[in-house]
Regions:
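Short hydrophobic helices that act as membrane-entry/anchoring signals
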Residues: 1-9, 60, 64-67
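Non-catalytic C-terminal accessory region of glycerolipid acyltransferases
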Residues: 79-179
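A generic local structural motif
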Residues: 8-16, 32-34, 81-83, 109, ...
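Conserved catalytic core of Hanks-type protein kinase domains
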Residues: 7, 40, 65, 87, ...
Length: 179
């Protein structure tokens, strides 16, 4: 898939997601972001995705086949975060878009809470250009960049609202700095 993406979108990937359990956290511009993010990792990523993607059989089948984790965005979804925590403790990697939507907004503290509970590193990723690829009535093929930052090493412990909020702020700044 990487050669096709490089050809169609002039895709440029800087850096790689490190092997081993980690939490990949990226900005969210379009529905192209999950496959672009998957191209940065040598191991499968389990995406936390809005539960609405499971409402229809084709979407449910695809999300299950890709190891997706359904999450309710209208409230704290402790069941989904618990499933993500189990995967991290089993050596798997999890991907999350802390903005929760392609329209932007405040970053949720879920990625920070997972990192604090498991000690898994947070990997900041910036995706540039995917919004332009799917804007308007026709598909465009702009230049796309995916920049993987240095992992944020986090000490495992009991997350408090203050520590999760502070870590989320640092993560957001790291993602924004990747240009």
């Amino acid at each position: 898939m990487r050669p096709l993406a490089r050809l169609l979108y002039r895709l440029e990937i800087e850096g790689r997601v490190p092997p081993g359990p980690c939490i990949v956290a990226a900005n969210h511009e379009s529905m192209l972001d999950p496959p672009l993010l998957a191209l940065t990792a040598s191991q499968p990523l389990h995406f936390l995705a809005k539960v609405e993607l499971w409402r229809y059989p084709p979407g449910a089948w695809l999300m299950d086949a890709l190891g997706g984790i359904p999450i309710r965005r209208d409230r704290r979804d402790l069941i989904s975060l618990g499933r993500a925590e189990e995967l991290l403790r089993a050596g798997e990697s999890v991907a999350i878009f802390p903005q929760g939507t392609v329209r932007g907004g405040a970053w949720s503290r879920g990625a920070a809470r997972l990192a604090l509970r498991t000690g898994a590193p947070l990997v900041p990723v910036r995706i540039v250009g995917s919004r332009q690829a799917l804007s308007g009535r026709r598909i465009r093929f702009p230049r796309l960049r995916v920049v993987v930052g240095e992992p944020l090493l986090v000490e495992q412990g009991r997350p408090t609202v203050a520590t999760a909020r502070a870590l989320t702020r640092v993560l957001e700044e790291r993602v924004d700095a990747l240009r």
